[in-house]
Regions:
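Basic/polar, cationic surfaces and motifs that engage anionic cell-wall
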Residues: 75-189
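Active-site-adjacent loop/helix surface patches within enzyme catalytic domains
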Residues: 1-103
Length: 189
């Protein structure tokens, strides 16, 4: 599994300093600067402290079973083209070295609904999907809230949370501009 994050810090240097500070108790395998430079901080086979509490596809302890990639971005602006190019190249390499399918490339928000929002609404998931580097959207039969919860769980959203948090989290990835009550379009997950 690969978990994509944004740093939510002023710049890459500040993020790198924090990610390498043992007292901060946070780390990731990689940091990709907005220039496209890739910095490896933890070996891929080693555990990093990037995911925290959460679950994806029925699996917990995400830190022990994933590679964390931090993107130098505050979460409020578009991701640089050079950064996305570098991310695509890095993901291709990781997916060649490890048994990570496109369905295993997720955002921090996907596995920690309500607790995390990264990589955020500005992240271009469709770009990764077109390259086969993230799972394409699946269409589920529209229905009521119970049907939606079942569909979301089938898509991987198994972390415990209330309905509104689940809806917000799935929209963050598939339709961050959508608001209001559950609708048929929300069943594209």
């Amino acid at each position: 599994m690969v978990v994509i994050h944004y740093t939510a810090m002023a710049d890459a240097a500040s993020a790198l300093e924090r990610l390498c500070d043992a007292s901060a108790e946070v780390s990731a395998h990689y940091l990709i600067e907005n220039t496209g430079e890739v910095v490896q901080m933890v070996q891929e086979a080693d555990r990093a402290w990037h995911a925290g509490a959460g679950e994806w596809g029925g699996l917990a302890d995400i830190n022990s079973r994933s590679i964390g990639i931090e993107l130098d971005n505050r979460g409020t602006h578009p991701f640089a083209a050079a950064q996305m190019d570098a991310l695509e190249e890095l993901l291709r390499g990781i997916m060649a070295r490890w048994p990570v399918p496109p369905e295993g490339v997720i955002g921090h928000s996907d596995m920690a609904p309500g607790r995390k929002t990264d990589p955020g609404p500005r992240f271009d998931w469709a770009r990764l999907e077109r390259q086969g580097l993230a799972a394409p959207a699946r269409q589920f039969e529209a229905g009521d809230a119970e049907a939606y919860i079942c569909a979301a769980q089938a898509a991987g959203y198994t972390a415990p949370c209330d309905f509104d948090t689940l809806l917000h989290t799935t929209r963050l990835r598939r339709a961050p501009w959508r608001t209001g009550p559950l609708c048929a379009a929300d069943f594209t997950l």
